[in-house]
Amino acid sequence: MKPTPSDWPRMSSSVFYQDAVAAIQWLCDAFGFEIRLKVEGDKGQIEHSELTYGEGLIMVAQETPQSERAWKRAMRSPKSQNGATTQSIMLFVDDADAHCAHARARGAQIIEEPATHDYGEDYWADRSYGAIDPEGHLWWITQRLRNPPAK
């Protein structure tokens, strides 16, 4: 048996929001994600969703601080934590500048303008920008310009 289902990447992240319905719509509109699955609870809240970007996948859900399950109580939006975040999410795109312009027009807070980062001829070069989504999650949007040479 393969350890990973055929339609899943080996690693994925879960991102929690106070308003997961609005977050999913925003992530699709601003960043270009597509909804693969959305499971709504009896009050319309998002219990689970899967959003794809190319072959990448993230899960988005409603934060539930009153949940009976300890892990669900622990998962919070930065908006619930005075804007504090302890991680970022990296997304590779085809054109970082065009993606930034599109995201900015849809309300992304750009915290670092697109810039080229060249780590030398033995390494890679990227063009990337940093953005904060409406609930405070930090995103690094990156375009690979050059791969490291084959060894």
Report residues per predicted region:
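Short, surface-exposed ligand-recognition loops at beta-strand->loop->(often short) alpha-helix junctions
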Residues: 15-19
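Vicinal oxygen chelate
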Residues: 1-14, 24-25, 31-132, 141-151
